[in-house]
Amino acid sequence: MRFLMFVAILFAVGLFLYRRRSFVEKSPAAQLTTGQIKQAWRELGFFCELDDRDRTWTLTGSRAGLLRFRDLLLAYVADPRHALQSEYEQYGPYGSLEVMTWPAAGFDGQSIRGSLPDLARLAGLVETKLAAAQPDSVLLIREEFAPDSAYTLRLDVRDDWFDPASADPDRLGAATKLPAPKTKG
Protein backbone atom coordinates (compact mmCIF):
# COMPACT_ATOMS: atom_id res chain seq x y z
CA MET A 1 0.00 0.00 0.00
CA ARG A 2 2.80 2.41 0.88
CA PHE A 3 4.55 1.54 -2.36
CA LEU A 4 1.46 2.44 -4.40
CA MET A 5 1.13 5.71 -2.51
CA PHE A 6 4.80 6.47 -3.21
CA VAL A 7 4.36 5.71 -6.92
CA ALA A 8 1.23 7.89 -7.06
CA ILE A 9 3.09 10.79 -5.44
CA LEU A 10 6.02 10.42 -7.83
CA PHE A 11 3.64 10.38 -10.77
CA ALA A 12 1.82 13.47 -9.51
CA VAL A 13 5.09 15.35 -9.01
CA GLY A 14 6.27 14.34 -12.50
CA LEU A 15 2.98 15.45 -14.03
CA PHE A 16 3.12 18.74 -12.13
CA LEU A 17 6.66 19.46 -13.35
CA TYR A 18 5.72 18.50 -16.89
CA ARG A 19 2.66 20.77 -16.93
CA ARG A 20 4.41 23.63 -15.13
CA ARG A 21 7.11 23.80 -17.78
CA SER A 22 4.46 24.25 -20.47
CA PHE A 23 3.46 27.55 -18.85
CA VAL A 24 7.01 28.89 -18.65
CA GLU A 25 7.68 31.09 -21.64
CA LYS A 26 10.68 30.12 -23.68
CA SER A 27 12.74 33.13 -24.64
CA PRO A 28 15.40 33.21 -27.31
CA ALA A 29 18.94 33.21 -26.08
CA ALA A 30 19.43 36.97 -25.99
CA GLN A 31 23.17 36.53 -25.60
CA LEU A 32 23.55 34.96 -29.05
CA THR A 33 24.57 37.07 -32.00
CA THR A 34 22.90 36.67 -35.38
CA GLY A 35 25.96 34.79 -36.60
CA GLN A 36 25.83 32.42 -33.62
CA ILE A 37 22.13 31.74 -34.21
CA LYS A 38 22.80 30.95 -37.88
CA GLN A 39 25.67 28.68 -36.92
CA ALA A 40 23.54 26.87 -34.32
CA TRP A 41 20.87 26.06 -36.95
CA ARG A 42 23.57 24.82 -39.32
CA GLU A 43 25.14 22.63 -36.63
CA LEU A 44 21.74 21.20 -35.75
CA GLY A 45 21.28 20.41 -39.44
CA PHE A 46 17.65 21.46 -39.71
CA PHE A 47 15.29 24.25 -38.72
CA CYS A 48 12.61 23.46 -36.15
CA GLU A 49 9.30 25.24 -35.75
CA LEU A 50 6.27 24.54 -33.57
CA ASP A 51 2.91 25.65 -34.96
CA ASP A 52 0.24 25.43 -32.26
CA ARG A 53 -2.51 26.54 -34.66
CA ASP A 54 -1.85 23.68 -37.09
CA ARG A 55 -0.62 21.42 -34.30
CA THR A 56 2.59 20.49 -36.06
CA TRP A 57 6.25 20.24 -35.26
CA THR A 58 7.96 21.07 -38.57
CA LEU A 59 11.58 20.14 -39.14
CA THR A 60 12.97 21.65 -42.35
CA GLY A 61 16.23 20.50 -43.87
CA SER A 62 18.00 18.42 -46.46
CA ARG A 63 17.82 14.63 -46.13
CA ALA A 64 21.26 14.65 -44.50
CA GLY A 65 20.22 17.47 -42.17
CA LEU A 66 16.98 15.74 -41.17
CA LEU A 67 18.92 12.53 -40.51
CA ARG A 68 20.66 14.52 -37.78
CA PHE A 69 17.29 14.53 -36.00
CA ARG A 70 17.44 10.73 -36.07
CA ASP A 71 20.98 10.93 -34.65
CA LEU A 72 19.83 13.39 -31.99
CA LEU A 73 17.10 10.96 -30.89
CA LEU A 74 19.51 8.02 -30.80
CA ALA A 75 22.03 10.03 -28.75
CA TYR A 76 19.23 11.03 -26.36
CA VAL A 77 18.19 7.39 -25.93
CA ALA A 78 21.80 6.28 -25.35
CA ASP A 79 22.39 8.81 -22.56
CA PRO A 80 21.65 7.14 -19.19
CA ARG A 81 20.60 10.49 -17.69
CA HIS A 82 17.43 10.31 -19.79
CA ALA A 83 16.20 7.03 -18.33
CA LEU A 84 14.02 8.78 -15.74
CA GLN A 85 10.55 10.10 -16.51
CA SER A 86 10.40 13.86 -17.17
CA GLU A 87 14.06 14.09 -18.20
CA TYR A 88 14.46 16.24 -21.28
CA GLU A 89 16.87 18.06 -23.56
CA GLN A 90 16.30 21.21 -25.57
CA TYR A 91 17.92 21.76 -28.94
CA GLY A 92 18.45 24.59 -31.38
CA PRO A 93 19.57 28.17 -30.78
CA TYR A 94 16.31 29.03 -29.01
CA GLY A 95 15.92 25.71 -27.19
CA SER A 96 12.60 25.34 -28.98
CA LEU A 97 12.97 21.65 -29.83
CA GLU A 98 12.41 19.59 -26.72
CA VAL A 99 12.73 15.82 -26.49
CA MET A 100 11.36 14.32 -23.28
CA THR A 101 11.27 10.93 -21.58
CA TRP A 102 7.63 10.13 -20.88
CA PRO A 103 5.62 6.90 -20.50
CA ALA A 104 3.37 7.60 -23.49
CA ALA A 105 4.67 8.42 -26.96
CA GLY A 106 3.40 11.64 -28.46
CA PHE A 107 3.82 15.11 -29.82
CA ASP A 108 2.33 18.11 -28.03
CA GLY A 109 2.79 21.84 -27.77
CA GLN A 110 5.81 21.41 -25.54
CA SER A 111 7.80 18.39 -26.62
CA ILE A 112 8.38 15.31 -28.67
CA ARG A 113 8.10 12.63 -26.03
CA GLY A 114 8.06 8.96 -25.29
CA SER A 115 9.80 6.16 -23.48
CA LEU A 116 13.36 5.49 -24.59
CA PRO A 117 12.20 2.55 -26.77
CA ASP A 118 9.50 4.82 -28.26
CA LEU A 119 12.05 7.50 -29.10
CA ALA A 120 14.37 4.89 -30.66
CA ARG A 121 11.40 3.71 -32.72
CA LEU A 122 10.75 7.31 -33.82
CA ALA A 123 14.39 7.55 -34.93
CA GLY A 124 13.83 4.44 -37.05
CA LEU A 125 10.65 5.89 -38.55
CA VAL A 126 12.46 9.09 -39.48
CA GLU A 127 15.27 7.11 -41.12
CA THR A 128 12.86 4.87 -43.04
CA LYS A 129 10.76 7.76 -44.33
CA LEU A 130 13.80 9.78 -45.36
CA ALA A 131 15.36 6.85 -47.25
CA ALA A 132 13.08 7.37 -50.25
CA ALA A 133 12.31 11.07 -49.77
CA GLN A 134 12.92 13.51 -52.59
CA PRO A 135 13.60 17.25 -52.24
CA ASP A 136 10.41 19.32 -51.90
CA SER A 137 8.53 16.43 -50.32
CA VAL A 138 6.75 16.58 -46.98
CA LEU A 139 6.68 13.55 -44.69
CA LEU A 140 4.17 13.28 -41.85
CA ILE A 141 4.66 11.11 -38.77
CA ARG A 142 1.88 10.61 -36.26
CA GLU A 143 -0.13 7.46 -36.90
CA GLU A 144 2.93 5.20 -36.83
CA PHE A 145 4.33 6.74 -33.65
CA ALA A 146 1.48 8.12 -31.56
CA PRO A 147 -1.93 7.81 -33.25
CA ASP A 148 -3.73 9.54 -30.37
CA SER A 149 -1.34 12.49 -30.34
CA ALA A 150 -2.84 15.93 -30.90
CA TYR A 151 0.21 17.10 -32.87
CA THR A 152 2.01 15.75 -35.95
CA LEU A 153 5.70 15.68 -36.83
CA ARG A 154 6.24 17.17 -40.30
CA LEU A 155 9.54 16.67 -42.11
CA ASP A 156 9.95 19.25 -44.87
CA VAL A 157 12.65 17.81 -47.15
CA ARG A 158 14.74 20.30 -49.12
CA ASP A 159 17.63 19.90 -51.54
CA ASP A 160 21.16 19.00 -50.48
CA TRP A 161 22.38 22.60 -50.39
CA PHE A 162 19.60 23.92 -48.17
CA ASP A 163 20.75 26.21 -45.35
CA PRO A 164 18.62 25.62 -42.21
CA ALA A 165 19.33 29.17 -41.01
CA SER A 166 17.41 30.49 -44.02
CA ALA A 167 14.16 29.05 -42.66
CA ASP A 168 14.32 31.12 -39.46
CA PRO A 169 11.27 33.44 -39.49
CA ASP A 170 13.51 36.33 -38.51
CA ARG A 171 15.32 35.69 -41.80
CA LEU A 172 18.64 35.38 -40.05
CA GLY A 173 19.96 33.27 -42.90
CA ALA A 174 20.20 35.52 -45.92
CA ALA A 175 20.58 32.88 -48.61
CA THR A 176 18.04 30.15 -49.17
CA LYS A 177 20.79 27.71 -50.11
CA LEU A 178 24.40 27.15 -49.20
CA PRO A 179 26.67 27.69 -52.19
CA ALA A 180 27.37 24.56 -54.20
CA PRO A 181 30.88 23.20 -53.74
CA LYS A 182 33.34 24.21 -56.42
CA THR A 183 34.21 21.49 -58.89
CA LYS A 184 37.46 21.06 -60.74
CA GLY A 185 37.56 21.50 -64.47
Roles of regions detected by a PLM:
Residues 1-8:
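Feature marks short, highly hydrophobic, charge-poor N-terminal signal-anchor/signal peptide-like helices
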Residues 8-14:
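Intrinsically disordered, low-complexity and often Lys/Arg-enriched segments
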Residues 14-185:
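Positively charged, low-complexity terminal tracts
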